[in-house]
Curated annotation (Swiss-Prot):
Location(s) in or outside the cell: Cytoplasm
This protein's name: Hsp90 co-chaperone Cdc37-like 1
Family in the record: Belongs to the CDC37 family.
Role according to the record: Co-chaperone that binds to numerous proteins and promotes their interaction with Hsp70 and Hsp90.
Annotated segments matching region Self-association: 2-171
Keywords: Chaperone, Coiled coil, Cytoplasm, Phosphoprotein
Assembly mode: Self-associates. Forms complexes with Hsp70 and Hsp90. Interacts with CDC37, FKBP4, PPID and STIP1.
Gene: CDC37L1
Length: 337
């Protein structure tokens, strides 16, 4: 008989030498949180606040992939051209130099925007009034009624159906194990998985389970980078996730640094949001004993995200020729970042 998910019992850190071999061993998952009944529509405002945090997280990852990863591609191309002395390559070399300069400028612009946003959030700490005003002005709150309800139902159904596997992926701690798991379950490479993991991080931090939050945050950023790489390259994400793991395991200069920087920034944002007034009502005492429903209950209560990206980003320097389709036999521990 299938056991209820998540299993009961106190949470603990995953095994030091890797993830748990059996899903039944994973007693680290918290009880399913739910929003308390707060006066004045505060519960709904709380959900909107988390939704806004998810939206901003996607925008940050988008900037990392668009600027930092493309910059690394341009630098690699520039380096390869420098190895040749043929005059016929002079024009190509000049174009590559211009591309590097433009990408560096874009990266600096995004960095300044991110710093300004973080400073503003530290001052405001996401007060209820600020959230209410921000939510009201967001286009995805006032969007047309034409939103496809079938897509919404499909997204909710997906997270309900594959909640166990999404959580299992969240607990993996090796690059090779994560790649192998996605190879066995390619349907998990999607926006719904990324959203579930992001929300899970917020609730873990609200429960004061920082160590577990950092583990899930790593996998959340992994999935986000895969999705943004696919959009950047205009390919199916199920066909390019191996490229991400190839670059991550090789710790290629530029690529891995962009991932580590975004991971640390994401964890900092989660901690910052958890300190805001909008997260204060979400405490451990508001949890109820597990009844087999699963944490998908809160996810279903959130409004569906819109099309996260409103414009396409530079794809000229994106190449998937180096994708490695062969799985490594020997697992390799990921760096603890």
């Amino acid at each position: 008989m299938e056991q209820p998910w998540p299993p009961p019992g106190p949470w603990s850190l995953p095994r030091a030498e890797g993830e748990a071999e059996e899903e039944n061993d994973l007693d680290v998952f918290p009880s399913s949180p739910r929003c308390p009944q707060l006066p004045g529509g505060s519960a709904q405002m709380y959900s909107h606040g988390i939704e806004l945090a998810c939206q901003k997280q996607k925008e940050f990852v988008k900037s990392s992939v668009a600027c930092k990863w493309n910059l690394a591609e341009a630098q690699q191309k520039l380096g390869s051209l420098a190895l040749h002395n043929s005059e016929s390559l002079d024009q190509e070399h000049a174009k590559a130099q211009i591309a590097v300069s433009e990408l560096r400028q874009r990266e600096e612009e995004w960095r300044q925007k991110e710093e300004a946003l973080v400073q503003r959030e530290k001052m405001c700490l996401w007060s209820m009034d600020a959230i209410s005003k921000d939510v009201f002005n967001k286009s995805f709150i006032n969007q047309d009624k034409r939103k496809d309800t079938e897509d919404e139902d499909k997204s909710e159904s997906f997270m309900q159906k594959y909640e166990q596997k999404i959580r299992h992926f969240g607990m993996l701690s090796r690059w090779d194990d994560s790649q192998r798991f996605l190879s066995d379950h390619p349907y998990l490479v999607c926006e719904e998985t990324a959203k579930y993991l992001i929300l899970w991080c917020f609730h873990l931090e609200a429960e004061k389970k920082g160590a577990l939050m950092e583990q899930i945050a790593h996998q959340a950023v992994v999935m986000q980078f895969i999705m943004e790489m696919a959009k950047n390259c205009n390919v199916d994400p199920r066909g390019c996730f191996r490229l991400f793991f190839q670059k991550a395991k090789a710790e290629e200069e530029g690529y891995f640094e962009a991932f580590k920087n975004e991971l640390e920034a994401f964890k900092s944002r989660v901690r910052l949001y958890s300190q805001s007034q909008s997260f204060q009502p979400m405490t451990v005492q508001n949890h109820v004993p597990h009844s087999g429903v699963g944490s998908i209950g809160l996810l279903e209560s959130l409004p569906q995200n819109p099309d996260y990206l409103q414009y396409s980003i530079n794809t000229a320097l994106c190449s998937l020729n180096s994708v490695v389709h062969k799985e490594d036999d020997e697992p390799k521990m990921m760096d603890t970042v």
